[in-house]
């Protein structure tokens, strides 16, 4: 120790720093996912319509289609997860140590985000298939389009599908944020 100072090496990994941007983006995206799934569920639940026909009243309900039931269930699952994720993101903003700060919980967050994204796109695409046939019919199977008859029902279903697509985009972006947090944790590992 003859007065020589040791220069720090810039190639060494430093301590893991807190990244408030991950938590802020995560909170915003989870709130948007929450709002989109609520809108999709409410629109689908309000989509019942009864119209008079020659054979008596005809009621179009989401409960009559298994694809629409899965649509409501899938959106409900993501709604619960988004609500819990929003709480976790709020806590991580205040405590500076949230689920994206530790490797194990960041992996769990990433996997849950990915599964919820898959559930949303599955529910949305299944309902979209039924809605497409309802709007355009299937001429080779002699299925007529029902949307000219129950137009309000179809409008609500269309709104729910648009909300689910928005929810999927927000949930997929949450998955990207979780993957980015995992990348930061992996590159700053000692």
Curated annotation (Swiss-Prot):
Segments on the Cytoplasmic side according to the record's topology features: 1-24, 92-113, 180-190
Pfam family name, one: CASP_dom
Keywords assigned: Cell membrane, Membrane, Transmembrane, Transmembrane helix
Tree of life domain: Eukaryota
Matches recorded under InterPro entries: CASP/CASPL, CASP_dom, CASPL
Transmembrane residue ranges: 25-45, 71-91, 114-134, 159-179
Membrane topology, Extracellular segments: 46-70, 135-158
Topology term for the membrane: Multi-pass membrane protein
Compartments (UniProt record): Cell membrane
GO CC terms, sorted: plasma membrane
PANTHER family: CASP-LIKE PROTEIN 1U1 (PTHR36488:SF8)
Family according to the record: Belongs to the Casparian strip membrane proteins (CASP) family.
Subunit structure and binding partners: Homodimer and heterodimers.
Protein name as catalogued: CASP-like protein 1U3
Organism: Physcomitrium patens (Spreading-leaved earth moss)
